[in-house]
Regions:
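Alpha/beta-hydrolase active-site loop
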Residues: 66, 90-112
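N-terminal cap/lid segment of alpha/beta-hydrolase-fold proteins
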Residues: 23-47
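C-terminal catalytic histidine-bearing segment of alpha/beta-hydrolase fold enzymes
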Residues: 194-268, 376-384
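Active-site glycine-rich loops that stabilize anionic/oxyanionic intermediates
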Residues: 49-51, 58-62
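The serine-hydrolase catalytic nucleophile loop
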Residues: 60-71, 86
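Short beta-strand/loop motif that positions the catalytic acidic residue
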Residues: 162, 167-170
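Active-site-adjacent alpha-helix of alpha/beta-hydrolase-fold enzymes
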Residues: 75, 169-217
Length: 396
């Protein structure tokens, strides 16, 4: 049995995010005419070749320029970007839906912009509201959301968008409390198992002084709100770019399932009858989306391995069969299930899955698992599979 693998991922470790050098001479200022006659100021950043697009809304006390660094990094990795200027003095009824639709339609109408794969990012109360409302109005095209330091009344949309990848970011030193709690509400209301929360902690939250959208300048900026976080946390733009690369280029509309986001499913797996229930949920989810995932491979695999360590091979097999159903091309999942079949007396199945693990490793067609593909870990899987086959060889 392989030792327990505990991996802690921190979204705030800059070493995990590759820095993307900004690209020069890709931006042009544009005027976008809204359906209500309003002229929206914007800046369009064109990628060198066709690719997805990202629409970025700024917070009320900043301008579209606050997103420029992110936009340039997006262009460098092949993603078109549009930053748009919104009027913080306008009410939602005045902005929605005409201004939002105009910005969205401008983005997807640009040469080289994939109109079917779009991401949206927003900062502050107004930016987050505009982002969620735009995603609601264009749910078929919007494949990813990034929300910084805001809130929205559209909680029902986040609850219903069960497969929309969402990245939430907030900081305790945000000068407009209770933004952290508002962002946490958005996160716990959202139902996507691939959603993530980047939370910059402090010993105390900032004191409440005034509301964000009103009387701009009354509250001194402290660097903890919206795109202001980029200065104090220089890795954050890279985290956002990496998120859009994953959800718009590598696996459009999908991100790896997150343990915290899928906590209810993980807990359900550990309850009596839970494996069968989650198995059915996964089958139903796959009917709608063949790429749907309800839980991370390594987290559920650890539950199965815990059963093995407790001398409960039948329970281990039950859980690990679910893991393999979710991740059928994982050499790791095949080898771990083979380890469980062996003490359960199912020798032929143990042989089959050990051989499948080796075949997957030898093909070099896919990563060894969904969570890691290092040569060291591939070696661990290989040694485990070969050990099982040796144990099954007569006379060994």
């Amino acid at each position: 049995m392989k030792p327990t693998r505990i991996v802690l991922f921190s979204a705030v470790l800059s070493g995990m995010i590759a820095f993307v050098a900004p690209t020069k001479n890709v931006a042009r200022d544009v005027n976008i005419k809204s359906g209500n006659g309003t002229i929206l100021k914007g800046t369009y950043f064109a990628a060198a070749k066709p690719g997805p697009g990202v629409l970025l809304f700024h917070q009320s006390n900043r301008t579209r320029k606050s997103w420029e660094d992110v936009a340039r990094q997006l262009v460098a990795v092949g993603i078109n970007a549009l930053t748009v200027e919104t009027d913080p003095n306008k009410t939602r009824k005045q902005r929605w839906p005409a201004d939002l639709n105009a910005a969205f339609e401008f983005l997807i109408s640009q040469p080289g912009a994939n109109r079917e794969v779009v991401g949206i990012g927003g900062a502050g109360v107004i930016g987050v509201e505009d982002s969620v409302e735009t995603a609601r109005g264009h749910s078929a095209e919007v494949k990813s959301l990034v929300l910084l330091s805001g809130e929205t009344e559209s909680l029902d949309f986040l609850r219903q968008a069960s497969q929309l990848p969402e990245l939430f970011v907030a900081a305790d030193d945000d000068e407009y409390p209770p933004i952290v709690e508002a962002m946490e509400l958005l996160y716990v209301t959202a139902s996507s198992p691939s959603r993530k929360f980047v939370h910059y902690s402090a010993s105390h939250e900032a004191p409440w002084l005034w509301y964000e959208p009103f009387d701009i300048g009354k509250v001194p900026a402290k660097g903890g709100h919206g795109t202001d976080m980029f200065k104090g946390h220089p890795e954050l733009p890279g985290i956002i770019v990496d998120w859009f690369v994953t959800t718009l280029i590598k696996t459009p509309g999908h991100a790896p399932a997150d343990t915290v986001a899928s906590a209810s499913v993980i807990n359900q797996i550990q309850m009596p009858g839970g494996v069968a229930q989650v198995t059915q949920q996964l089958i139903e989810a796959r009917r709608k989306d063949p790429e749907a995932q309800l839980f991370p491979e390594i987290t559920a695999s650890t539950i199965g391995q815990d059963h093995m360590r407790a001398g409960e091979p039948k329970s281990a097999v039950e859980v690990l069969k679910l893991v393999l159903l979710a991740y059928p091309e994982s050499a790791d999942a095949n080898e771990t299930l083979a380890e469980a079949y062996l003490p359960d007396g199912q020798k032929e199945l143990a042989r089959q899955h050990a051989e499948k693990a080796l075949a997957l490793l030898d093909s070099h067609r896919l990563p060894a698992s969904s969570w890691t593909d290092t040569e060291q870990y591939r070696g661990e899987i290989r040694r485990g599979a070969e050990k099982i086959l040796k144990q099954l060889t007569p006379g060994s």
